Design a protein with these regions (language model features):
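C-terminal His-loop and adjacent cap/lid subdomain of alpha/beta-hydrolase
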Residues: 1-398
Length: 398
């Protein structure tokens, strides 16, 4: 009645019927991989075309499929029906959370972003990895590897995080306790790698930067990219699984050394007086103004028939009830000189930067204050010292 107000986010709740059977894909993935690696033939006598040729198996997923790999592991599907392992190694890339596969009316996916399915079921699964992880917000115990640790079927596990995961996808609870007061010790079979100064979608290089001033406040994208890093780490995972070669230690921001902080503690340098080409015309970039926006992480109650620690059951309270207890969100601290983050794996573009790659952006819609989904920002350096001093830009010049 009277139309929609763009200042609000609307969620439609309705009575549905005839839910599909969901979660079968987890069993299908388990049984398919197990068949190819260890069976001579299927139950109909059809020969396995690669019987005896597979010595090790690696599973990899990016973003939503990475979340699904974590759900696969969390729910115990890395134990084959014969008791053996399904995957010897697993790499969940830019995958901060889990996904909604195992509930009635499940909708696999769900962004969990501020304006992209903020109350997705996949938000309720444990973020901590360790089998003894204690969630002090919900009071629940047990992390992602709890089931596989019980059955001795845990894979060697890599988790990769871009910078956007911290701002928009609540990435920090995998690194700290739920209240954000101490760094977590990670399982021996796991490594976590933070790709410094990157956005969720990768890209990289100045050619990947686009600027639509009516859509985003700053040029969209990050020159810093994780593509080469991801490939190198995947080979490290293979070496760990196949040859027993220890991979690099986890590289993440930490509370202990001041590289993981509350959003309000960030300290960016002044970035002023720059332009970027829009349709062949040099267009002014607004002077950078840090607003401290991030996607919060409240504890939701979906009703007594929903089992959050199993990502299972029936949601009877929709929209879910906000219990008023939020998980702490922390973000990587930046270098006061360049604005690039201080921790994590720094690619060539971060070691020899052409400007500041920022892990978030803001929408440019008048009257709306919000993060620009999963995109980052790029603000170039001035070409000369004289130009940057005249503009009041505190960063180095090219």
């Amino acid at each position: 009645k009277g139309g929609f107000d763009p200042a609000y986010l609307y969620e439609l709740v309705y009575v549905a019927k005839d839910p599909k059977v969901m979660g079968v894909g987890l069993a299908a993935l388990r049984d398919t991989v197990s068949f190819f690696r260890s069976k001579a033939a299927d139950s109909n006598g059809t020969p396995n075309p690669v019987a005896g040729r597979i010595t090790h198996t690696l599973g990899q997923g990016t973003s939503q499929s990475g979340n699904a790999m974590k759900t696969f592991l969390h729910l115990g599907f890395n134990q084959a029906l014969d008791g053996g392992k399904v995957f010897d190694g697993m790499y969940a890339h830019v995958a901060a959370r889990q996904t909604n596969i195992n509930t009635r009316f499940a909708v696999p996916g769900g962004g969990g972003g501020l304006r992209t399915d903020h109350t997705a079921f996949g938000q309720t699964a444990p973020r901590g990895l360790d089998k003894d992880y204690m969630d002090d917000i919900s009071g629940r115990q047990g992390g992602v590897v709890k089931r596989c640790a019980t059955t001795n079927t845990c894979p060697k596990f890599f988790l990769g995080l871009s910078g956007t995961e911290f701002w928009q996808l609540q990435g920090s609870p995998v690194l700290t306790d739920a209240n954000g007061t101490k760094d977590l010790a990670q399982p021996d079979n796991a490594r976590i790698y933070y790709y410094a100064s990157t956005q969720h979608g990768g890209a990289g290089g100045t050619a990947s930067i686009a600027y639509a001033p009516t859509r985003a406040t700053y040029p969209t994208g990050t020159v810093v990219q994780f593509n080469d890093t991801f490939r190198a780490l995947f080979l490290s995972l293979e070496d760990w699984v196949v040859r027993g070669t220890q991979p690099p230690a986890s590289q993440v921001p930490k509370l202990a050394d001041g590289t993981l902080v509350r959003p309000e503690a960030l300290s960016f340098p002044a970035m002023k007086g720059l332009t970027w080409a829009v349709g062949g015309v040099q267009t002014a970039i607004p002077d950078f103004s840090y607003r401290g926006l991030y996607n919060n992480f409240p504890l939701f109650d979906f009703g007594p028939q929903y089992i959050p620690q199993d990502e299972a059951g029936i949601a009877t309270v929709l929209p879910p009830r906000n219990l008023g207890r939020d998980y702490a969100i922390l973000v990587p601290q930046v270098d006061a000189s360049t604005g690039l983050t201080r921790s994590g794996i720094r690619s060539v573009e971060a070691r020899a930067p052409l400007g500041t790659s920022i892990e978030f952006n803001y929408v440019a819609t008048p009257g709306i204050t919000d993060l620009a989904n999963l995109t980052g920002s790029f603000i170039p350096f001035h070409k000369t010292r004289a130009a940057r001093l005249a503009a009041g830009d505190a960063r180095p010049s090219l």
